């Protein structure tokens, strides 16, 4: 796995179609998985002292699978460092990636790269969480915009998806129904409604969303949606 590194500026094509939902927090935005780099890409928000010294406000970082899992759990909500470390430790025991990296090393790496949650957002700064919830809503794959852009094959697939939706697992059907009736909503809207951050079911919900993305039932706005033949 590649070591943690960063890149300032620039863009590259990311395959988001089968990856976990775009994940936004007050300190970073999950951009997706790069097959070329074999790494998860996070755009991180740098603190004021870095910007005042001439650095950029946003810098892209590359995380391997284990570092990404730690980052994902640590940023499900803004929590204390003690809780953060405990969550990361629990993940270490569940991790099936070999060889396992020492937990303290990964924790320190993320902290040094400014990827750990801040105790509170800096004053007069718009958080990436707020930006992300505005620019990255989910849309159901059978939306009117999809109909307008695609051919009969898309219509056929979209209608078939609706029929198959009745046979989705309970949790996936619940999520699908929520986004069908709430255009423009994000994962965080669903998380707030179901209070999943408190009952620690966000990873299970994330897996269900990933399944829906893979099956083509829904896709985030701005992502390319191509129904399967």
Where are these regions (language model features)?
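Short, amphipathic alpha-helical interface elements at domain boundaries
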Residues: 20-79
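Charged, low-complexity, helix/coiled-coil-prone segments
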Residues: 10-13, 41-56, 148-157
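Long, charge-rich, low-complexity alpha-helical segments
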Residues: 59-229
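Intrinsic-disorder/low-complexity coil detector
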Residues: 1-2, 46
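Long, low-complexity, charge-rich intrinsically disordered regions
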Residues: 2-27, 36, 202-229
């Amino acid at each position: 796995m590649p070591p943690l590194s960063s890149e300032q500026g620039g863009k590259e094509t990311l395959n988001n179609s089968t990856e976990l939902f775009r994940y936004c927090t007050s300190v970073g935005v999950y951009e997706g998985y790069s097959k070329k780099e074999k790494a998860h890409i996070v755009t991180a928000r740098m603190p004021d002292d870095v910007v005042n010294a001439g650095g950029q406000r946003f810098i892209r970082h590359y995380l391997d699978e284990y570092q990404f899992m730690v980052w994902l759990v640590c940023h499900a909500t803004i929590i204390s460092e003690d809780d953060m470390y405990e969550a990361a430790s629990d993940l270490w025991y569940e991790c099936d990636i070999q060889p396992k990296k020492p937990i303290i090393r990964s924790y320190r790496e993320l902290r040094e790269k400014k990827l750990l949650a801040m105790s509170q957002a800096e004053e007069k700064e718009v958080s990436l969480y707020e930006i992300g919830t505005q620019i990255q809503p989910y849309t159901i794959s059978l939306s009117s915009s999809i109909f307008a852009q695609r051919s009969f094959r898309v219509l056929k697939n979209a209608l078939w998806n609706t029929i198959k939706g009745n046979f989705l697992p309970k949790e996936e059907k619940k999520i699908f129904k929520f986004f069908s009736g709430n255009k423009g909503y994000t994962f965080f809207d669903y998380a707030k409604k179901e209070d999943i951050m408190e009952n620690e079911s966000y990873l299970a919900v994330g897996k269900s969303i990933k399944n829906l993305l893979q099956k083509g039932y829904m896709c985030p706005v701005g992502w390319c949606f191509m129904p399967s033949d």
